[in-house]
């Protein structure tokens, strides 16, 4: 039995990943940094290791190294941006010292996808569809605005979950808002605001070292929170061959090996699809792939261990809810009673939940509690809602 270690195991995706791995026959351990969290109560995690936060990177890597010295781990899989970046930066050292496999690309490749401006600059150079995007600094505000146009959004180069993203409609808006975002999140880009229909797409792919796609899933995201654009709380798995083809071409250009996740928006007026960002880690909605026949966690483990992996049989048509976040959507959305399918459709043959299930209900309850507590914190609420 292989031993799998999840980093950032407190996140919601750890529930889906642990469930998929455990049902496939692996032993699952997880580094958890938050007591009130999904992973803290997930029944599919065999061992919980209370770990420091990734913010102190040196301490975190020392802690990880000490753990690997005392325990056999075959594969490490990061669940979130911070741990994915740390693992990628230290991949060569960890694999050499501990004979462990790190399920993350080498850092030069990882950084091109993780960094918002670098990833879209690659799209610009290679002709992949994307919104006009430019690096933003206090010295180039007018130049960036002239290239991107208005309305636009200021987006931190390194962030997740819509944190730090604000809309601007004039140079005066940029001058007023940019310094605040820069102080909190660091370097930013200015990106043209896409007037979209309210629906966006999430494309998950796995590219092998031979350059073959051995797994893919497309989510049509219909409800998300924050309402201005954020994490999926209701989506459906669909077929969309052109999206898969575009994203696969981007991964080919990157010489990517491993799992990747794309966010794509459709322009309301033209119907054109544009890549918004690339996430080089497992998304919260990974369970949508699993219930549609694509077991990405197993694909990841088998591929990094050098085993042969066959293409998965993708069976779309499933609905996936993130109940804790969907509750927040219901509280804030003016469409709460008009939306179709109805928010009150809790059960059905093809309805699934990413934050828990009947056999593992506690993560859903814990997620609701921790989510409410986070939104009571003014700084977190402002980063998400701007209020």
Which residues does each predicted region cover?
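Conserved protein kinase catalytic/activation segment
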Residues: 271-273
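Short glycine-enriched loops at secondary-structure junctions
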Residues: 32-37, 81-83, 209-213, 219-221, ...
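ATP-binding N-terminal substructure of ATP-dependent carboxylate-amine bond-forming enzymes
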Residues: 1-103, 367-384
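Residue-level detector of structured alpha->beta connecting loops
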Residues: 72, 99, 149, 185-186, ...
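Active-site nucleotide/adenylate-binding loops and adjacent lid/helix of ATP-dependent enzymes
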Residues: 110-197, 207-212, 241-245
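Peripheral (often C-terminal) accessory segments that flank ATP-dependent C-N-forming ligase machineries
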Residues: 142-144, 302-387
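ATP-dependent carboxylate/phosphate-activation module, predominantly the ATP-grasp catalytic core
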Residues: 172, 180-181, 192-255, 279-305
């Amino acid at each position: 039995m292989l031993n799998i270690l999840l980093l950032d195991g407190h996140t919601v995706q750890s529930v889906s990943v642990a469930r998929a791995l455990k049902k496939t026959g692996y032993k699952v351990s997880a580094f958890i940094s938050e007591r009130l969290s999904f992973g803290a109560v997930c029944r599919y995690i065999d061992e919980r290791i209370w770990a420091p936060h990734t913010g102190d990177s040196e301490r975190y890597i020392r802690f990880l190294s000490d753990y690997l010295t005392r325990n056999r781990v075959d594969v490490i899989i990061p669940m979130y941006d911070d741990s994915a970046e740390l693992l990628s930066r230290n991949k060569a050292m960890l694999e050499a010292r501990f004979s462990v496999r790190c399920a993350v690309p080498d850092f030069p490749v990882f950084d091109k996808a993780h960094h918002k401006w670098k990833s879209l600059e690659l799209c610009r150079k290679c002709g992949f569809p994307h919104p006009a995007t430019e690096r933003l600094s206090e010295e180039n505000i007018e130049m960036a605005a002239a290239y991107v146009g208005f309305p636009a959004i200021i987006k931190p180069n390194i962030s997740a979950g819509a944190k730090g993203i604000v809309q601007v409609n004039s140079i005066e808006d940029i001058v007023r808002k940019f310094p605040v975002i820069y102080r909190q999140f660091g370097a930013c880009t200015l990106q043209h605001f896409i007037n979209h229909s309210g629906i966006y797409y999430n494309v998950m792919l796995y590219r092998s070292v031979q350059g073959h796609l051995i797994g893919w899933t497309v989510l049509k995201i219909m409800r998300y929170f924050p309402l201005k654009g954020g994490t999926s709380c209701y989506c459906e798995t669909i077929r969309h061959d052109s999206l898969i083809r575009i994203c696969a071409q981007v991964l080919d250009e990157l010489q990517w090996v491993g799992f990747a996740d794309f966010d794509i928006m459709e322009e309301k007026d033209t119907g054109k699809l544009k890549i918004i960002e690339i996430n080089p880690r497992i998304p919260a909605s990974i369970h949508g792939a699993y219930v549609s026949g694509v077991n990405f966690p197993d694909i990841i483990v088998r591929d990094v261990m050098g085993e042969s992996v066959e293409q998965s049989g993708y069976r779309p048509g499933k609905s996936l809810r993130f109940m804790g976040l969907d509750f927040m959507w219901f509280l804030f959305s003016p469409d709460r009673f008009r939306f179709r399918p109805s928010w009150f459709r809790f059960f059905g043959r093809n309805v699934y939940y990413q934050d828990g299930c009947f056999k593992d209900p506690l993560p859903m309850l814990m997620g609701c509690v921790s989510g409410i507590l986070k939104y009571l914190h003014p700084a977190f609420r402002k980063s998400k809602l701007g209020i």
